[in-house]
Curated annotation (Swiss-Prot):
Phylogenetic lineage: Archaea, Methanobacteriati, Methanobacteriota, Methanomada group, Methanococci
Protein name (database record): Shikimate dehydrogenase (NADP(+))
Domain of life: Archaea
Source species of the chain: Methanococcus maripaludis (strain C6 / ATCC BAA-1332)
InterPro entries: Aminoacid_DH-like_N_sf, NAD(P)-bd_dom_sf, SDH_C, Shikimate_DH, Shikimate_DH-bd_N, Shikimate_DH_fam, Shikm_DH/Glu-tRNA_Rdtase
Keyword Oxidoreductase: yes
Length: 279
């Protein structure tokens, strides 16, 4: 029940009306019995600069940041976590004692979703499709203990990201780059970090041939609308394990939730809430 002591957390982005974040976070709040509520706010680019001062004035506990504000929000924050600085994007803001602190939980969200299916990720050969904002967070996290190859339509962008990560993580030989027609037979994990295949353009497929994929490989797509994007449907034809973006959404959200509240949410409760909405 909302009262004068209820703490507000939320999501800012544009658009946000189809977001599952309020559903899963409010389910976790109810499950833990804590006095919080989570709302989604559609914020245009021109109004972004007012969000931080407004959130401070209203004593909001914190908020998630989604497309298109993950990079631009950084210039308005008081502090930025070291990993988020290295990634160059923020998806979580905590407000404490009048100070805003930015974090990025996207990479750890993907890692935990993968480990749920594949076990501990160490020394795996991972192929990352895309070199945009999502790719930066995922690549930064997974490159810490694995071997990465980043591919992109624009090979120069893949090269720039791989070199940047190699420098930041001091891993010169384990982060490579290549073209979309790369030989995939030696990869343990393949991850699409691009929006290719996302609603409403659900018939479009990242141009990665999977015919040489090994049977033990895992294919992940960060898209969760639709739940079975065309890239995963293609992977299923080869009998490999597939993971959609729902797990990443839940796990990155769970880390954000703990940053704001100090409480560890039940990810099963969060997943169940989303699944009941989808079905």
């Amino acid at each position: 029940m909302i009262d004068s002591k209820t703490k507000l957390i939320g999501l800012i982005g544009h658009p946000v009306e189809h977001s599952f974040s309020p559903i899963m976070h409010n389910a976790a709040i109810k499950d833990l019995g804590i006095n919080y509520t989570y709302l989604a706010f559609d914020v245009s680019e021109e109004n972004l600069k007012y969000i931080v001062s407004g959130a401070k004035a209203l004593q909001i506990a914190g908020f998630n940041v989604t497309i298109p504000h993950k990079i631009n929000i950084m210039k308005y924050l008081d502090e930025i976590d070291e990993d988020a600085k290295s990634i160059g994007a923020v998806n979580t803001v905590k407000i404490e004692n009048g100070k805003t602190i930015g974090y990025n939980t996207d990479g750890i969200g993907v890692k935990r979703a993968l480990e749920e299916k594949s076990g501990i990720l160490i020394n795996k050969n991972i192929l990352i499709i895309g070199s945009g904002g999502a790719s930066r967070a995922v690549s930064f996290e997974l490159a810490k203990e694995n071997n990465l190859t980043i591919v992109n339509r624009n090979i120069e962008k893949a090269k720039i990201l791989s070199e940047e990560l190699s420098t930041k993580l001091k891993k010169e030989n384990s982060i490579k780059y290549g073209a979309l027609n790369i030989d995939i037979k030696n990869f343990d994990i393949i991850i699409n970090t691009t929006p290719v295949g996302m609603y409403p353009d659900t018939d479009v497929n990242p141009v990665i041939p999977l015919n040489d994929i090994k049977k033990s490989a895992v294919v992940m797509d960060l898209i969760y609308n639709p739940l079975e994007p065309v890239f995963l449907k293609e992977a299923m034809k080869y009998g490999v394990e597939t993971i959609n973006g729902l797990g990443m959404l839940v796990y990155q959200g769970a880390v954000s939730f703990q940053i704001w509240t100090g409480k560890k949410p039940d990810v099963y409760v969060m997943k169940k809430a989303i699944n009941s909405k989808i079905r």
